[in-house]
Amino acid sequence: REKIEAAVHELGYMPNLAASALASASSHTIAMVVPNLAEAGCSEMFAGLQQILQPAGYQIMLAESQHRVEQEEKLLETLLASNIAAAILLSVEHSTTVRQWLKNASIPVMEMGAIRSDPIDMNIGIDNVAAMYELTEMLIQRGYQNIGLLCANQEQWIFQQHLHGWYKAMLRHHMSPNRVINAALPPNFSTGASQLPEFLLAWPELDALVCVSDELACGALYECQRRRIKVPDDLAVVGFGDSDVSRVCQPPLTTMAVPHRKIGSEAGRALLERLNQGNWSDRKSIASSLCMRESC
């Protein structure tokens, strides 16, 4: 029995609980597992998926792993044994066990949100390297010389992608890429406010700050107001995401827009193509776009 269990684990075998009853039936349920329903862009991507999949007769079963590896494994173990037509995940880190299960599953698997170098199967999202490069390049072209980068509590692979784009732009213009803080804190308003003084203490020459989320950037803007630092005259601040808050903070925030709804709808179309015809390319990059406002 131990040998059988070891072989089952090694092969990533998952018994189909509905196989006897549904062997001849085709499922129209697609499972979507997300770390947190409040994750940036999650609701917009879900809406994009629904827009395409629902008219085609597919229903999306949404589950939340709460950023817990064991919870994601438990959810997917149940879902993969329940005759689902496809699985959708956000572009986040997954355990070796989950990756093995999904690679061995005879269903389409879509990771969406950001382009990965090692997708499980299908992958649609923005290119974080290109997006960060474009955001940094824009500041350089506008004459800023002493630019900093604020990151906070990102998945390591996303941090590396942002850092790659940042280094690429800065080194292309022979500028120092070393003004970087990667805070082990949530990417929220209070972190942005608390980290700005750290930048000014370490690099008083700072004239522009790139933040990897709009919430971080708006927190930095609030701290600038408290310290009577004029934005953008004394310090330019830019964000990432084009969230609602970027439009209402003062001054309105220049940011990199991520087309979450389009990512969702493109993922839906790709899944339909795979489900109906059995073919689709592994990856597709969706362009992000600069939203120029008054903070730089």
Give residue spans per PLM region:
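Flexible glycine-/small-residue-rich
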Residues: V34, S91, G113
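Short beta->alpha connector loops
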Residues: Q66-V69, L90-T96, E215
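Short conserved active-site loop signatures built around small residues
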Residues: I4
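Redox-cofactor binding/interface segments in oxidoreductases and associated redox assembly factors
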Residues: M32, L89, C211
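Bacterial carbohydrate/catabolite-sensing allosteric modules
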Residues: E10, A47-Q59, K74, L80, ...
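Amphipathic helical "hinge" segments at domain boundaries
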Residues: L11-T78, S82-A86, H164-K168
